[in-house]
Regions:
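Active-site microenvironments that recognize anionic phosphate/pyrophosphate groups
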Residues: 1-71, 76
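Histidine-centered divalent-metal-coordination microenvironment in nucleic-acid enzymes
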Residues: 73-78, 96, 123, 127-148
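Short acidic, glycine/proline-rich loop/turn micro-motifs
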Residues: 86-89, 149-150
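Long, well-ordered alpha-helical scaffolding segments within enzyme catalytic domains
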Residues: 89-113
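A short glycine-rich, hydrophobically flanked beta-strand micro-motif that places a catalytic Asp/Glu
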Residues: 111-126
């Protein structure tokens, strides 16, 4: 194969080329009312099935990425908008990493990948699409895949 193309990421990539952060609908990543997209998802007003939220805990939740690097790409994040790890309370920190552990186990059980990437992009320069709201990526990987982008 000469080229691997993740067509489902086109709206995201083309939005970056235009200097705009977009979600699957092409809308900005904020909620239109000063909240980040993740804060809107955390509130749960739009229904979990419609917004791809797969788990809710007291301080954190998990959501399928609408621009997945691979099938099964999840994000785990605190409900509260926090830019980096040092801004988390102890309760949020513990639940975040416990949820990441559970997300990895779920991905491994459901998809049987050859491995899993777990990563956090802290700040726009590090690749964070929504730098004001920490999120941990859980990305299933298979031998020979080359579609990992940050």
């Amino acid at each position: 194969m000469d080229r691997l193309w993740a067509g489902w990421r086109y709206a995201y990539v083309s939005g970056l080329n235009e200097g705009t952060d977009v979600q699957s609908s092409g809308a900005p990543v904020d909620g239109g009312d000063g909240r980040t997209l993740f804060e809107v998802l955390a509130d749960g007003d739009h229904g979990d099935e419609e917004t791809f939220v797969v788990h809710r805990g007291p301080t954190c939740f998990a959501v399928l990425n609408v621009f997945p690097y691979t099938s099964g790409h999840l994000m785990v994040l605190p409900r509260r908008a926090v830019a980096d790890l040092s801004g988390l309370t102890d309760e949020e920190y513990i639940e975040l990493w416990a949820t990441v552990r559970d997300a990895v186990a779920a991905v491994e059980t459901a998809l049987d990948p050859g491995g899993v990437n777990v990563g956090v992009n802290l700040g726009r320069a590090a690749g964070a699409g929504i730098p004001g709201h920490l999120h941990v990526h859980v990305v299933p990987r298979w031998s020979g895949d080359t579609n990992f982008t940050t």
